[in-house]
């Protein structure tokens, strides 16, 4: 089999040649500095895993583990007491749920293990993939620093967007593991395309692609774009194409066969429900992604040398997807923004160790160094998750986002499977401890009566709602407990105060 593919782009040819020579003193110092900086950043993330700060969707994933832990074969809806499928029941979460069931570990401890595994896969995946692009020993560390710090001057916290501050809050999410798998997938695919990979390897690649898509659909789109770019860059001989087709077919079959939810139903289930919340992805591009611009310049240089450069093609595919989302109003397509950002981040890191005159590489190094310093400063608030806020300088403390307070205070009364009437943030957190809510705290497109549940919940907490209406809602949904903030329900004779939590929260028992 003849495959015209080189694991290194022309821009990095000198890096490969230089690997066999003794490095110059400046290069050795630079490599040591990059490794030390990457090590410090990873140490910070490791310490964050121990604390596991909660600000966002952590409760959703904890609730998913609760259901899988108690009923691994038929978990039902993770948030409400209903027998519906859920896209949160991914292969990774099923595995973690089994771990929780076998070991008896608390779901938050399991999520700490998930965070550690996700970060490990992300770091090793970046290392492996970058080694397919450059043999320079400093390249992986520079690429990892770029991935974590080259975003914008304003931290942007969203799952699947692996900035340092974002990862500090989302390391336990399936998106982190999925992105790590994506990097491994691209590295494995690149090697399969240039080597004599057998049918078994290609079948495994197809299964891995399906697992990535099942674990986090948005990151799966990014992974798919990167895979297409890798195939385009390979200039593979015709004999390889049947194997690519088989891998794709195996992946589609695996997606179809997954028993916990219908993957293909997701394409029509959401409707326009995802678009309003995702419009924010397109806002403030300079503040959120501006530090990536030098990487775009590096991509242009790579593309001029090779029209099929994998990073350049990856970037262009990402631009097409994200741009189409903006033009069509499908703002959820903005979740593919990492397909735009990641190639630029890697391109800038590789430009520092690539081919060309020394002064050119020095220029790229200055750009990268300045951008990393700016990005590190922008995301310095992540230090607040391992250092007490009072010990931080004021300008750093101002960048810190305080995590949410947990709802462990309700657990002496609320048992597993109890239905709790809750709204707002409470509805996002209560299911993490085993309870159900009446209305889901997150959009659920497989729940047919979601709108009615939301309306019932809103009416229940209305100041002028008759007691008879509240009692009817309690009977209909089997409500045993109510969580509310303030004293709006204190005069209701059908409720009894049993506990008070932080920030004015009150737990009522239904009489």
Give a label for each model feature.
Residues 122-130, 169, 181-193, 225-232, ...:
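Transmembrane alpha-helical segments
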Residues 249, 355-382:
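Signature aromatic-anchored transmembrane alpha helix within multi-pass, membrane-resident enzymes
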Residues 189-210:
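Short hydrophobic alpha-helices at membrane interfaces in multi-pass membrane enzymes
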Residues 4-7, 224, 380-511:
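Extracytoplasmic
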Residues 31, 139-142, 198-201, 240-247, ...:
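Membrane-interfacial loop-to-transmembrane alpha-helix junctions, especially the N-terminal start
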Residues 222, 330-365:
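Hydrophobic/aromatic-rich transmembrane helices and adjacent perimembrane loops
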């Amino acid at each position: 089999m003849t495959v015209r593919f080189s694991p290194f782009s022309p821009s990095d040819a000198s890096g490969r040649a230089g690997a066999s020579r003794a490095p110059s003193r400046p290069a050795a110092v630079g490599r040591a500095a990059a490794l030390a900086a990457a090590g410090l950043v990873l140490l910070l993330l490791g310490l964050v895993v121990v604390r596991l700060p909660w600000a966002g969707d952590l409760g959703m994933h904890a609730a998913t583990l609760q259901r899988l832990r108690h009923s691994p074969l038929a978990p039902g809806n993770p948030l409400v007491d209903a027998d519906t499928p859920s896209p949160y029941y991914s292969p990774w979460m099923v595995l973690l749920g089994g771990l929780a069931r076998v070991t008896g570990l608390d779901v938050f401890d399991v999520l700490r293990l998930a965070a550690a595994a996700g970060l490990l896969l992300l770091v090793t995946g970046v290392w492996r993939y970058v080694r397919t692009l450059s043999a320079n020993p400093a390249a992986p560390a520079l690429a990892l620093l770029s991935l974590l710090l080259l975003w914008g001057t304003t931290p942007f916290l969203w799952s699947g967007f692996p900035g340092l501050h974002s990862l500090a809050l989302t390391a336990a999410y399936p998106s982190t593991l999925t992105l790590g798998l994506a990097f491994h997938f691209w590295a494995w695919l690149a090697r399969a395309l240039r080597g004599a990979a057998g049918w078994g390897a290609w079948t495994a690649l197809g299964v891995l692609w399906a697992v990535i898509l099942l674990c986090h659909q948005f990151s799966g789109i990014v992974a798919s774009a990167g895979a297409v770019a890798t195939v385009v860059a390979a200039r593979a001989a015709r004999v390889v194409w049947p194997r690519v087709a088989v891998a794709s077919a195996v992946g589609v079959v695996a997606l179809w066969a997954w028993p916990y939810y219908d993957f293909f139903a997701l394409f029509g289930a959401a409707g326009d429900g995802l678009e309003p919340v995702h419009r924010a992805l397109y806002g403030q591009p300079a503040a959120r992604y501006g530090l990536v611009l030098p990487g775009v310049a590096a991509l242009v240089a790579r593309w001029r040398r090779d029209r099929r450069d994998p990073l350049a093609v990856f970037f262009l595919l990402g631009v097409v997807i994200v741009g189409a989302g903006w033009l069509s109003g499908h703002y959820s397509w903005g979740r593919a923004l990492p397909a735009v950002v990641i190639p630029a981040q890697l391109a800038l890191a590789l430009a520092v160790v690539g081919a060309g005159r020394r002064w050119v590489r020095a220029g790229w190094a200055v750009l990268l160094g300045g951008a990393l310093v700016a990005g590190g400063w922008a995301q310095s608030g992540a230090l607040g998750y391992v250092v007490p806020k009072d010990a931080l300088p004021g300008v750093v403390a101002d960048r810190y986002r305080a995590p949410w307070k947990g709802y462990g205070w309700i657990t002496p009364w609320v048992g597993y499977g109890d239905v709790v009437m809750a709204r707002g943030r409470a509805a996002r957190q209560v299911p993490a401890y085993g309870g159900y809510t009446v209305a889901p705290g997150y959009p659920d497109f497989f729940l047919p009566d979601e709108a009615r549940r939301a309306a019932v919940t809103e009416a229940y907490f209305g100041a002028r709602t008759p007691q008879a209406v509240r009692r009817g809602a309690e009977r209909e949904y089997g409500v045993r407990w109510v969580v509310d903030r303030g004293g709006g329900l204190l005069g209701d004779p059908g409720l009894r105060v049993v506990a008070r939590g932080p920030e004015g929260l009150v737990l009522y028992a239904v009489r």
